[in-house]
Amino acid sequence: TIDVEGREALIRRRGRANIKEQLAILRRAAAQGAQVMVVECMAVQPELQRAAQQDILRADIGVITNVRRDHTDVMGDTLEQICDALCNTVPRNGVLFTAEEEQAGRMSAWAGQLSCAFVPVRPQGDEPALDFPENTALALAVCQHLGVERATALEGMARFRRDPYALSLHRLGRGVFINGLSINDIQSTCMVWETLREKYGLEDRE
C-alpha cells in the first residue's frame, strides 16, 4: 500500500489474498483523511467481485482496462461471460472508464442499468512511453475527471517507481530475458511480444 504521504508498506499475509484486506485499508485511508483511494479489485469469482464493490468498496469510479481470456475457470469461457463477471464491479450511480473496444457495448449496457456514466477511452497518440498507451490514457482520463490537469498528472506519472514485477526486458549475452510475470493471458502475451519485437528488433525463433 502507499499512504497519503507516499510511504509504502507491505501487506503481510498469513494465507491467500482476501477481499477482507480492503476493510483495513479503507479504515487506514479514512484515518489519514484521504480524499481519493485507488484500489484494485482482488476478486476473480463473480460473487466476490460483486461483494467487493457493493458491500466493501462502494467505489464511485470504476476502471476496467480490457476484457481478456483470463481466469476462465471461474469467470467463464467466452469474452462475453468474462465481461459480465468484470461488470459486477460497475459502480452504481458512478462513472465507468474503459479502454476495451470489443465488449464496450456490453459494458455500456451494464452501466446503463446501474445509472452509471460510461466513458470509453482511446489513446490520443501522444501518451508518454510510461506503459501501454491504453493504460496511460485511462489514468489520464480518470485524473481529468477528478480535476487534475493533464500536465500535472503526467509530471506525477514520470516520477513513479515501477513495480518489480512489471514488464521488463533484460539482455543476457546473445539472449534476451523478458520479465512477463504480470501477463496472465495468451492475448496479452502475444500483444506484448509483438510490441517488444517491434521496439527492440527481436526475432522469432523455432
Can you annotate each of these PLM segments?
Residues 127-138, 162-166, 182:
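Short glycine/threonine-rich catalytic loop with a Thr-x-Gly-x-Asp
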